Amino acid sequence: MKTLVYKEIKEKLGRDFILENPKNKNLAHFATPLAFSLAKELKQNPMIIANDIVVKLKDCDCFESVEALNGYVNFKLSKAFLNSLATQALSDSENFAKDDKKEQSFLLEYVSANPTGPLHIGHARGAIFGDTLTRVARHLGYKFDTEYYVNDAGNQIYLLGLSILLAVKEHCLKEQVQYPDEYYKGEYIIDVAKEAFAEFEKDFFVEENIPQLALWAKDKMLKIIKQNLADAKIFIDAYVSETSYYSELENTLKALKEHGGTYEQDGKIWLASSVKGDEKDRVIIKDDGKGTYLAADIVYHKDKMSRGYDKCINIWGADHHGYIARMKAAMEFLGHDSQNLEIILAQMVSLLKNGEPYKMSKRAGNFILMGDVLEELGSDVLRYIFISKKCDTHLEFDVDEFKKEDSSNPVYYINYAHARIHQVFAKAGKSVDDVMYAKFESLNEDGMNLLFESLNLKAVLNDAFESRSLQKIPDYLKNLASLFHKFYNENKVVGSDNEDEFLKLFAICALSIKIAFALMGIEAKNKMNHD
């Protein structure tokens, strides 16, 4: 809708301009401050320029009114224009709020948790944000691929193998074992150990077989992780292995050296990242000749940045904040534009249950598992919660608040609007097809506001994607549901003279809720549990 209005105005004025969304929709649906930017150029009073703009635009069919106010030009859309948009949306509902295919392409790498155990609630936040970003981007016409970087090398994988071996010895072979200071613990380790004991012969469980056991356990853990993600309706396009990049390490080091990106000191190879704004230089090859985690990660990012995507996006935990400068420095040394590597940080999550800290999982020791919270709340509610606040802000929520069946629970409140609309159609004995060509002739201001917001979904999605502020989608839905409930409570629908008109209004509202929820990975309810 906003795009159509912009094109209409640009055609008449012959220039680009800013089109704003005023908060008071009773005053205007859109406004432009163009007169202020032209005032310097034309050396005229912006009030006079605004009046000239009004004269040029007042005959546009899409506007009910075009008015100048304090230098701004305000536009109110006509019922006929909004009606045509609503009819088009309902007749082609599959494509509502979609955008034309865009040339810009993205590669999103997210989750990428070590394959040493199930996902915890911190992983879940980045996972749900990343999946929602993907859904919205694809809906808006972007090429948007997704990837999970599997850290299947290094000490943590050896520790996994050792932890499984010790658990087999203790719980299956009934031996006395001495656990090291660092190892993986929890019921999930014991469960996998029992699977390993059933898979291999008894004499397999010796120290020299730890590497083989570790690789076997890593695959088991990845299956658990993929199941955690699937339970939250998250499916990642590709899983790429850290070890698969080792053969490229030498070439990458050579390229870094050629561009002045590394130097040797104290028997180590250092990335000269401080030259590019990092707080200090970083070791990438240790004095034993082995690469650090950063070294492997540089190789992986070099590959990603060389695949032809316009932008590579990473979602990292907030504890990786200090990692951004060194990775961008490495990419710059390798000849890539670091502006094309975007890092989104997922902040910490604090869970409460009835006002008290949520209990840690017995299965994982000192973590709250994603699977446990999914089991308690369900995927739809958890997804809503994690999208409801900007990803880089701390999130605290009480699971019991989202079990309430009243307006204090936004998931319930929005679903109730959608279900109510289905009930009204059932009560009227009509379908969307029956009312698709009804005309909006008698809508009051509340009805017009509901209609405008229902048709404004695409603009909300574009704004949410471009600003990476996905919380704008649930904010939009809460407002839309509020507008609907207000109109529903104050107007008779079934049996009124305006029945078809109101039903058409409700149909476009329900369509917006359904699509916005689907892009959040949530299924809109047609019927509430108590109905």
Swiss-Prot record:
GO terms for biological process: arginyl-tRNA aminoacylation. It is found in: Cytoplasm. It is an enzyme of class 6 (ligase). GO terms for molecular function: arginine-tRNA ligase activity; ATP binding. It holds the Pfam family DALR_1. It catalyses: tRNA(Arg) + L-arginine + ATP = L-arginyl-tRNA(Arg) + AMP + diphosphate. Keywords: Aminoacyl-tRNA synthetase, ATP-binding, Cytoplasm, Ligase, Nucleotide-binding, Protein biosynthesis. GO terms for cellular component: cytoplasm. A motif ('HIGH' region) lies at residues 113-123. Its EC number is 6.1.1.19. Monomer. HAMAP family: Arg_tRNA_synth. Belongs to the class-I aminoacyl-tRNA synthetase family. NCBIfam families: argS. This is Arginine--tRNA ligase. The gene is argS.
